[in-house]
Amino acid sequence: IEQAPQLIEAGAPIAVCTGIPGNIRHPRIRIQGEDAHVGLPRRFRRDAALAGADLALALDVLWAEEEAAGRPMACTIGRFHTLAERHALTVVPGSFELSLDLRAWEAGRLAALERRLHGI
């Protein structure tokens, strides 16, 4: 079963699966900042949600770089949220959680991606 439009793009009516990429999964990454009132000036904030957004954007850049270098991979953020028990319109979030699944065809490439993740 083809899960992406790659067959249509290639003009191929059928294909044979020749492998399954390996993966590294991080089911729960927590970014810890500091809860604060909405009135706190930006320079004093430790906004965990913005840090999560920065991480997501950095992962997208990493993915684009890998593909541009001819190294296919996949990066999926399945969960991306502040903590429900702390949700409030006027609170700078002090905690943020996400899940991450990184995939690549070669074990060495996957290890390199994990190192790059830790460098973000």
Short names for language-model regions:
Residues A112-I120:
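Short amphipathic alpha-helices in soluble, non-transmembrane regions
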Residues I1-G108:
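Midchain, well-structured core segments that form catalytic/ion-binding scaffolds
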